[in-house]
A protein has these predicted regions:
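Auxiliary Fe-S-binding modules of radical SAM enzymes
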Residues: 1-21, 225-303
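Conserved AdoMet/S-adenosylmethionine-binding subsite of the radical SAM
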Residues: 112-261, 266-267
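Hydrophobic packing within well-folded, soluble alpha/beta domains
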Residues: 36, 58, 64, 68, ...
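Extended, non-globular alpha-helical segments
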Residues: 53-59, 106-121
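N-terminal pre-triad scaffold of radical SAM enzymes
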Residues: 9-63, 80-89
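Class I S-adenosyl-L-methionine
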Residues: 98, 119, 213, 286-289, ...
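Iron-sulfur cluster-binding cysteine motifs and their immediate structural context
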Residues: 37-44, 63-82, 92-108
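Short glycine-enriched, charge-decorated loop/helix-capping segments at active-site entrances
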Residues: 55, 195-201, 269-277
């Protein structure tokens, strides 16, 4: 396989206690075939670097407006404003900003560069930690992800793949099979509703989960529960029945809605669609958890 594969990455988290077993390094690739209404990582949707503007850090110097070749940055003498209908993410403004109010989501790494970064973390992985590669959607860059998994496994590093399951390539399916652990998102059982809320139907996602399950290798299911979208009683019960029929599911992570992604939407100049959605109470979260526990599943809230 080629050794000069490159992919855009928007975050690398060292010393994570989520996204799999033990202490992990989690890599977030930039680009996803889904566009979920409730996405908490909107910077992971596009496959190219994007301008990040944190207006709270802007000191109103106007230097960015003077260097923007597109005229996409307006300055009113106090603050800068980015016109996203004009901005083409050329990033010419970055060096002009003295406060890093203008920054970038995403940069390219080769497999070698990424592996050297995570290899340094081996000492704190211990017996049950390792590396998780997700996104965005890691299998959107199937050759890169597969090669990275191979490199980690050759170094005896435990690998986890975090995936939405919408995998259409042979290399992506090989990565799904090869990873020591798969964290698999299930967003809904009704395909029409799934298409409305994520942009794609769910038949491929269900098929690929059954494929991974047939290999008798570890799976953690991740369930985003969003009021008005995925929390209907019929969807929850059908999901619980489906998961209970699988043989390789080690845990189900119930992920109640949160608002941690709100700032990222502001930084990208995008509307935050679920801003008005209410949060669950702790008692409601426990009731959601019990739906899956009643089917004999090992369940936790968060993860």
């Amino acid at each position: 396989m080629e050794k000069n594969l490159r992919a855009p990455i928007f975050n690398i988290v060292h010393g994570s206690f989520v996204d799999g077993w033990g202490t992990r390094t989690t890599v977030f690739l930039k680009g996803c075939p889904l566009c979920c209404v409730w996405c908490c990582n909107p910077e992971g949707q596009k496959t190219t670097p994007e301008l990040k503007f944190t207006q709270a850090d802007c000191i109103g110097c106007g230097k960015c407006a003077s260097v923007c070749p597109q005229g996409a940055i307006q300055w009113d003498g106090k603050l800068a404003f980015v016109d996203r209908t004009i901005c083409n993410d050329c990033l010419a403004c970055l060096d002009a900003c003295p406060t890093n109010a203008l920054d970038v989501f995403g940069m390219y790494y080769s497999v070698d560069e990424l592996f050297r970064l995570v290899e340094c973390d081996q000492d704190y992985f211990g017996d049950n930690g390792g590396v998780t590669i997700g996104g965005g959607e890691a299998t959107f860059f199937p050759d890169f992800t597969l090669e990275f998994i191979h490199r980690c496994q050759q170094a005896y590093i435990h690998t986890a793949l975090d995936t939405c399951g919408y995998i259409l390539t042979d290399a992506g399916l090989e990565a799904l099979a090869q990873a020591d652990l798969v964290l698999y998102d299930i967003k809904g059982m009704d395909s029409d509703a799934h298409r409305r809320y994520t942009g794609v139907p769910n038949e491929v996602i269900r098929k690929n989960l059954l494929y991974r399950d047939s290999l008798h290798k570890d799976i953690i299911i991740r369930l985003p529960i969003i009021p008005g979208y995925t929390d209907s009683q019929s969807n929850l019960l059908e999901t619980a029945d489906f998961l209970a029929s699988l043989k390789s599911v080690r845990r189900v992570d119930v992920l109640p809605v949160h608002k941690y992604g709100a700032l990222k939407y502001e930084q990208l100049g995008k509307p935050y669609i679920i801003g008005g959605v209410r949060l669950y109470t702790p008692e409601e979260e426990q009731r959601l958890k019990s739906i899956f526990e009643q089917k004999g599943l090992n369940v936790q809230i968060g993860g």
